[in-house]
């Protein structure tokens, strides 16, 4: 596997990565009650940065208090949060790796009680609940939409200029606020923010445009999940046309990358479930072309990741593979993948334990990795 294109260097933004294995953004609930990352969060990311030239994307990070729909998730709107994230960034950079922060607003997918405790209401593009019987969100006003856009810009500036992140990823996937505007299954507005493909795209595109203006196009990526039905998404009739329009406009902005989530893993975990024939996003991958990197996520393992870059997209040199659960349990994942070393099994029960380092810092590096040289000197590029 060491000769795979998975282990060839690739430029992304202002850096050159040494391989194409990416740490997925994954919520872990390791922030305090004020949204400040706990002291050992820097060790978690530092462990996974130990192979030089690795791209890490942080867990979803709330852009403002009203965007933080769950307890013990981190934010990026006040100085204590920025300072804690700077420690994380410094740790990752000391290992020779690269880290981007994911900007997040939860919208109707929030825990309503958590918002209420903080003095906020459940809100979204429209008054459509995430599922039948769930709390009904309040549609955002024009002024509130503008406020959210400004908060995304401030979050990007805080991340890049304040904490020193190499870039930011706008979370437009998985049924959170940007997705709630993008898809007609949620967005029933009849103003400039809904009612047509162009109008439903406006919120996410305006966020992206203004963030690009604030921090630079080579420091901005966008994550989308076109086929996901998670949190009430993926059921609109013109889904392909909607995402073709949105992605084509992102491409025109020449952003650093696009991050696409497929739902192939659902077929494995939920036998009998029906997924779209293009669940692997080939339509959108081909549409993006070789312009800038394409990050693909969706339950990949060593074999399927290799096939993706070496066979499915052998004619494109910009495909990167995003790993989530396997990266939780294997902090040296790129090293293991290149040498064919068996992966450690993850423990789902420890994924989301607030104020605990169990299942967070205690997965060991493989002995081969430790024997090779000091962990901060390891490079896996072929």
UniProtKB/Swiss-Prot annotation:
Substrate binds at residues 171, 174, 352. This is Probable inactive dehydrogenase easA. It holds the Pfam family Oxidored_FMN. Belongs to the NADH:flavin oxidoreductase/NADH oxidase family. Keywords: Flavoprotein, FMN. Probable inactive dehydrogenase; part of the gene cluster that mediates the biosynthesis of fungal ergot alkaloid. DmaW catalyzes the first step of ergot alkaloid biosynthesis by condensing dimethylallyl diphosphate (DMAP) and tryptophan to form 4-dimethylallyl-L-tryptophan. The second step is catalyzed by the methyltransferase easF that methylates 4-dimethylallyl-L-tryptophan in the presence of S-adenosyl-L-methionine, resulting in the formation of 4-dimethylallyl-L-abrine. It comes from Claviceps fusiformis (Ergot fungus). FMN binds at residues 25-27, 60, 102, 171, 223, 299, 324-325. CDD domains: OYE_like_FMN. It comes from the Eukaryota. One of its GO terms (molecular function) is NADPH dehydrogenase activity. InterPro entries: Aldolase_TIM, OxRdtase_FMN_N, Oye-like.
């Amino acid at each position: 596997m060491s000769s795979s294109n998975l282990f060839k260097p690739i430029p992304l933004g202002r850096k050159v990565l040494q391989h194409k294995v990416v740490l997925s953004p994954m919520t872990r609930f390791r922030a305090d009650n004020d949204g400040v990352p706990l002291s050992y969060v820097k060790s978690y990311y530092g462990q996974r940065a130990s192979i030089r030239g690795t791209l890490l994307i942080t867990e979803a990070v709330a852009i403002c208090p009203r965007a933080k729909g769950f307890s013990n998730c981190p934010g990026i709107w006040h100085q204590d949060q920025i300072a804690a994230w700077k420690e994380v960034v410094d740790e990752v950079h000391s290992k020779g790796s690269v880290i981007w922060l994911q900007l997040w607003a939860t919208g109707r997918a929030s825990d309503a009680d958590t918002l209420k405790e903080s003095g906020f209401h459940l809100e979204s593009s429209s008054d459509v609940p995430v599922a039948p019987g769930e709390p009904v969100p309040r549609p955002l006003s024009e002024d509130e939409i503008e406020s959210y856009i400004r908060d995304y810009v401030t979050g990007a500036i805080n991340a890049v200029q304040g904490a020193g992140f190499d870039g930011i990823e706008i979370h437009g996937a998985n049924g959170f606020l940007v997705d709630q505007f993008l898809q007609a299954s949620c967005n029933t507005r009849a103003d400039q923010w809904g009612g047509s493909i162009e109008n439903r795209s406006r919120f996410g595109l305006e966020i992206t445009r203004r963030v690009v203006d604030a921090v630079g196009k080579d420091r901005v990526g966008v994550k989308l999940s076109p086929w996901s039905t998670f949190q009430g998404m993926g059921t609109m009739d013109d889904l392909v046309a909607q995402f073709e329009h949105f992605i084509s406009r992102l491409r025109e902005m020449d952003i650093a990358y696009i991050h696409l989530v497929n739902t192939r893993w659902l077929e494995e975990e939920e036998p009998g479930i029906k997924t779209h024939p293009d669940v692997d996003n080939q339509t959108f991958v081909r549409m993006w072309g070789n312009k800038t990197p394409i990050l693909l996520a969706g339950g990949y393992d060593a074999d399927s990741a290799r096939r993706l870059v070496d066979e499915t997209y052998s004619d494109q040199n910009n495909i990167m593979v995003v790993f989530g659960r396997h990266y939780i349990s294997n902090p040296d994942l790129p090293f293991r993948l290149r040498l064919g070393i068996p992966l450690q099994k993850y423990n789902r029960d420890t994924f989301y334990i607030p104020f605990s380092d169990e299942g967070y810092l205690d997965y060991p590096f493989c002995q081969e990795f430790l024997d090779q040289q000091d962990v901060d000197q390891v490079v896996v590029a072929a």
